[in-house]
């Protein structure tokens, strides 16, 4: 997943142009809650920020995802990963995402936008029947409140917008201007200490779960 290996040289010029065109369209007119991060030197390395949907345990989080195009794309689906740690039935320990769109339901005319929207939908409606994280799948089916609490806690620890710099909406997070810092420096230090203490406590709770 973290490999620097690229398949650019194995993709046809037509496929590269098609992918680049779609990414640029998404950058100009982004889907709600999704911000694509274009790597112009390697179109096979596609990353995006997805806002956690409201009303889910992932709300208020920002999740970085990665799509890896193989040499046979679009005849074969890309692999998809969460780079941000997440507690979800359809996400493996290494971040790999399991969704039918990227397996038996794949069609060559499904684009990057469709894949990212499908991943966002997976945050709203997980599929515990095809779980890669069996613990999360079982917990969702049998003890939803515990599942929701665990997923929320992971979101608060690992998916805070400050870790990504911006949210998928494009708004800067925790980026105070010089004048703000001048007047609020002490308050910010106190808040940071409180946040750090809270995160440590949550991590201890996670270990006990």
From Swiss-Prot:
Biased segments, Basic residues type? 200-209
Q: Cite the entry's keywords alphabetically.
A: ATP-binding, Cell cycle, Cell division, Nucleotide-binding, Transferase, Ubl conjugation pathway
Entry's Gene Ontology BP terms? anaphase-promoting complex-dependent catabolic process; cell division; exit from mitosis; protein ubiquitination
Domain spans labelled UBC core: 14-160
GO molecular function terms noted in the UniProt entry: ATP binding; ubiquitin conjugating enzyme activity
Q: Which reaction does it catalyse?
A: S-ubiquitinyl-[E1 ubiquitin-activating enzyme]-L-cysteine + [E2 ubiquitin-conjugating enzyme]-L-cysteine = [E1 ubiquitin-activating enzyme]-L-cysteine + S-ubiquitinyl-[E2 ubiquitin-conjugating enzyme]-L-cysteine
Q: What is its EC class?
A: transferase
- Check the record and name the InterPro entries matching this protein: Ub_conjugating_enzyme, UBQ-conjugat_E2_core, UBQ-conjugating_AS, UBQ-conjugating_enzyme/RWD
On whether Repeat is a keyword of this UniProt record, the answer is: no
Which pathway is this protein engaged in?
Protein modification; protein ubiquitination
What superkingdom heads the lineage?
Answer: Eukaryota
List of catalytic residues: 98
- According to the UniProt entry, which residue ranges have a biased composition of type Basic and acidic residues? 171-199
Residue ranges of region Disordered?
164-209
Q: Which family does it belong to?
A: Belongs to the ubiquitin-conjugating enzyme family.
- Role of this protein: Catalyzes the covalent attachment of ubiquitin to other proteins. Acts as an essential factor of the anaphase promoting complex/cyclosome (APC/C), a cell cycle-regulated ubiquitin ligase that controls progression through mitosis. Acts by specifically elongating polyubiquitin chains initiated by the E2 enzyme vih/UbcH10 on APC/C substrates, enhancing the degradation of APC/C substrates by the proteasome and promoting mitotic exit.
Query: Could you identify this protein by its name?
Result: Ubiquitin-conjugating enzyme E2 S
Species source reads Drosophila yakuba
């Amino acid at each position: 997943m973290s490999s620097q290996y690229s398949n650019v040289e194995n993709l046809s010029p037509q496929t590269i142009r098609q992918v680049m065109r779609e990414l640029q369209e998404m950058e100009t007119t982004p889907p709600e809650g999704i911000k694509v991060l274009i790597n112009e030197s390697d179109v096979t390395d596609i990353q995006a920020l997805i806002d956690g949907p409201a009303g889910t345990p992932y709300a208020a989080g920002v999740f970085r995802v990665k799509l890896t195009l193989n040499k046979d794309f679009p005849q074969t689906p890309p692999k998809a990963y969460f780079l941000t740690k997440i507690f979800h039935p359809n996400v493996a320990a290494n971040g790999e995402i399991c969704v039918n769109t990227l397996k038996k339901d794949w069609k060559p005319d499904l684009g990057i936008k469709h894949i990212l929207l499908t991943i966002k939908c997976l945050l709203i409606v997980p599929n515990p029947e095809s779980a890669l994280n069996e613990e999360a799948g079982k917990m969702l089916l049998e003890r939803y409140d515990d599942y929701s609490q665990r997923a929320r806690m992971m979101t608060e620890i690992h998916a805070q917008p400050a870790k990504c710099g911006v949210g998928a909406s494009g708004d800067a997070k925790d980026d105070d201007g010089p004048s703000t810092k001048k007047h609020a420096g002490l308050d910010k230090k106190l808040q940071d200490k409180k946040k750090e203490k809270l995160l440590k406590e949550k991590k201890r709770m996670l270990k006990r779960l």
